[in-house]
Amino acid sequence: MDGSRVQLWAKTDPFLLGALQMPPPAKFSMHYLRKMASYVRTRATEGCYPRLYWAMWRHIACGKLQIVEETAWLYFETFLSVFERSVAQSLDWAEVASTCPSSEKYEEIKSQLSVDTLKFILFLYIQQINKISLRAPMIESEWPSPRSRSPTPDFVAQSSIYNKVWDDYSHYNFIHNHLTYILELLMEPKQLSIVTQSSHCILISAEVVNALGFLIEGTVDKNRAVNHFLDLAVWQPVQIKSGFIETSGAFSFQKLQAWIKECLVINPFGITACIKSGTKLSWAQQVDGLNKRAKVACNTYKVPHTHRMVVMSQISKQTLAKSSKTLVDARVKIHRCSDCYIYLLSPLRSVTVEKCQNCTIILGPVQTVLHIQMCYNVKIIAVCQRLSLLSTTNCTFHILTPTRPLFYCGNQGAVLAPFHIRYSMLEDHMAQTGLATVPNSWDRPFLFSTESNNSNIWRLMPPEDFFTFVVPFEMEGDTTEIPGGLPPAYSNSVQQRQQKIHTWQKTVKDAGLTREQRKQFQAVVEMKFNEWLSKTENRHQLDSLVS
């Protein structure tokens, strides 16, 4: 570290991957979370502190915060899988969970899971970023809009929420405006009573400052290296400003708060910087007759490996296919694409697909969250840690996932189907992202909205409508089959269809056609095939593959 000025910023991942895109439960307010923070500290010997075990969180969530057990597990599992488990630990957990002989044994194993208590409390608190303000203007219209309808309460909520998790300015404002509350949440219970009277006397432990590193990181060398928040706070040249007292190993509450606010800046590795000053990639073709140009930008060549980001926008009427180091471990946003096929065959950190229509998107394994919002008639094919949907219409999802697909508000006509592709590097990419073939919960969605009784939200794809999907590219690798195979009903449907084809081929072979008759028959088959290509719009995909 040199003598340059310290810069601090809000991390992207806690908001992008951790903030569930629904207004938080009423009892996730400061009042109740402060009570929870005091409660867990006074019950350290009961599995509450410094690690909070699932059984105790379930007790607190269901008994005191009055949320149902399914929702309590959703928050716990999200934090654990996204922020605490390594790739190896994820694979180990998949093996343990998939081999449990009974539900009782599974619950017993779950009771052994734990999370960092202070960081988990911060995780619960940042759900407030999606709290709905009735004074906030509705500036976004529904998109796409295949039909006219009056805004519902859930749609008003979604309009206010969907852009915040990617917005660097929202993250900055949240930390800046809520910093006092965040610090208070992490304090010892006995300190809370005096914080408003004499904050200059209060000391914050290094443990609390370390927990703040869940939300904040920074640099002192103009973004060449990213440092942990605690390392910056105890750095000798800034100790006077940060309030660090070497003799006690603690920090002055007042000085620490002032120093953070003074050093806080917009995330230099966020989406704003990526779009403004990132590298423009020539992956997409420019199609004549379109009003807006296709754009692909990344920050891969300018940022540390853990901060990679790729943004794709306005891809239309083409096939875009990439397997690239640029995509590895990147946070990907696919925005306003239409009438196209997109293949991103690399291991990805997270993916958001937003405001797209009439697209087929095939993804490499997504280590954390695959989120689809405000899309119409989109087909998604992927292996992911979690699938979440917000305001989608007539979309199809071929998914392999260890967690239940999460349906927020505004979804209609979603079709869930088994994962059905392979490419040569797929299993290697799954291993890199900590994703296994079991357990697989693709067909058990969790409806996390007020519309849970609406039968039009989702359905399973009937086996007779199911077809396998071929990735039309060659790569080096060992995967030769669909990972995990197909569920029996879908496998049987594919086999029956193949048997009909074999029977038809044998019938043609045994028909004793002359050479002229075979030529005529071939011409008819080709004509019908071309008619089918045009009718199903597969002609466009073939033409774009050739070009």
From Swiss-Prot:
Pfam families registered for this protein in UniProt: TBCC
Q: Which UniProt keywords apply?
A: Cytoplasm, Cytoskeleton
Q: Does the keyword Heme apply?
A: no
Gene Ontology annotations for the cellular component aspect, listed alphabetically = cytoplasm; spindle pole centrosome
**Which PROSITE patterns does the annotation name?**
C_CAP_COFACTOR_C
SS bonds (residue pairs)? none
Q: Which domain of life is it from?
A: Eukaryota
Q: Do you know which SMART domains this protein is assigned to?
A: CARP (SM00673)
> Which SUPFAM superfamilies does the UniProt entry name for this protein?
C-terminal domain of adenylylcyclase associated protein
Q: Where is the C-CAP/cofactor C-like domain?
A: 304-435
- Main location per UniProt? cytoplasm
Q: Name one GO biological process term.
A: maintenance of Golgi location
Compartment(s) of residence:
Cytoplasm, Cytoskeleton, Microtubule organizing center, Centrosome; Cytoplasm, Cytoskeleton, Spindle pole
Q: Which Gene3D superfamilies does the record associate with it?
A: 2.160.20.70
The job of this chain, per UniProt, is described as:
May play a role in the regulation of centrosome and Golgi apparatus positioning.
Q: Which family does it belong to?
A: Belongs to the TBCC family.
Its protein name is TBCC domain-containing protein 1
Origin organism of this chain? Xenopus laevis
Output the lineage of the source organism.
Eukaryota, Metazoa, Chordata, Craniata, Vertebrata
Gene of origin?
tbccd1
